[in-house]
Amino acid sequence: MGFKCGIVGLPNVGKSTLFNALTETAAAATANYPFCTIEPNVGEVPVPDTRLDALAKIAKSAETIPTRLLFVDIAGLVRGASKGEGLGNQFLAVIREVDAIAYVLRCFEDDDINHVEGRVDPIADAETIETELMLADLDSLEKRIPTLDRRVRGQDKEAKKTLELVERSLVLLREGKPARMAQVSDEERASFKALNLLTAKPVLYVCNVDEDSAAAGNAHSARVAERAEAEGAGCVIISAKIEAELAELSPDERKAYLAELGLPEPGLNRLIREGYKLLGLITYFTAGPKEARAWTVTEGTRAPQAAGVIHTDFEKGFIRAETIPYDDYVALGGESGARDAGKLRLEGKDYVVKDGDVLHFRFAN
């Protein structure tokens, strides 16, 4: 699994159209009225990576298995969702479990598609979404205080630390600032994450533009990109309409259509790349006659923990990792050539896995 991304947005911004296109399914009932996504839709998509195909060809692998990305499509939020208006409130618990939140913002003009606020303003839309998520976080934290207070009076040291984090986060939220702006030390990071705050999650702005703006964006998406840069958030320009059309085509037709539009790749690729960047994820590979497979870990993951992604026994019995950088593996024609050229390294438990490493783990049964 690459990462789990919750998709949120106001009604009629193209959110479910995008979800359907990305997952190549019509599971969401797209229609021009609010709340057409009645239940959270969950879709898995393979992460496209040309490196995997190259490895499979060299290793003569019978099968290629990409890592996967999980999208959770949440019903359209409206102003007041955190107070139970619309259908937004019941879905907040669902998006607490995701790694990042994609704000789908309407960056196109179309008189035939109504905007719930009666205007096209992606910055205002982003602020509406953020406000509802902040209000939900406020409610969640305020409800924790009585229990934490009782535990603190009982000399519970962990509760005292948690209460300090809660109070610090509440100060920010009451000032209209998201929890991700909180100053958190390395020791506090795990406890802060356990608060499961919506506004502490990384944000990826998805600018849904018209077809003519898919390559370079437009004035609306430019404003969003400026905001994203100021916040350190991710930003990607996508035309949900184009993505929906691409989803219906064969690989060859898709390639021709992209060339005709002047687009180097589908929007999904850009979305995944931004997500990886935002979450600090990397991919390593395993390759052999049976299969070539991609695995996703966070930057800074050491070899035993990377092995544990395959199976917990690999981590428990880890001895060492046979390691070949991707470029060397390809240039030297695979494991045998890399070994002969002295490019295969034996790495121990302190080795930090790098993006593109081709690994074979040795472990004790």
Model-predicted segments: where are they?
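C-terminal-of-GTPase-core extension/linker across diverse P-loop GTPases
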Residues: 2-8, 13, 19, 147-354, ...
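Short, glycine/charged-enriched secondary-structure capping and boundary segments
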Residues: 22, 84-87, 116-119, 218-221, ...
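Amphipathic alpha-helical transducer elements in NTP-driven molecular machines
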Residues: 35, 49-52, 65-71, 85-98, ...
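Conserved nucleotide-binding/hydrolysis micro-motifs of P-loop NTPases
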Residues: 25, 51-52, 75-78, 106-112, ...
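Glycine-rich, flexible loop/turn motifs
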Residues: 26-34, 41-43, 51-54, 83, ...
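Flexible beta-alpha connector loops of hexameric P-loop NTPases
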Residues: 77-84, 118-133, 152-158, 212, ...
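Switch/coupling subdomain of P-loop NTPase systems
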Residues: 89, 96, 100-103, 108-136, ...
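Conserved G1/Walker A P-loop phosphate-binding module
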Residues: 1-112, 123, 142-143, 148
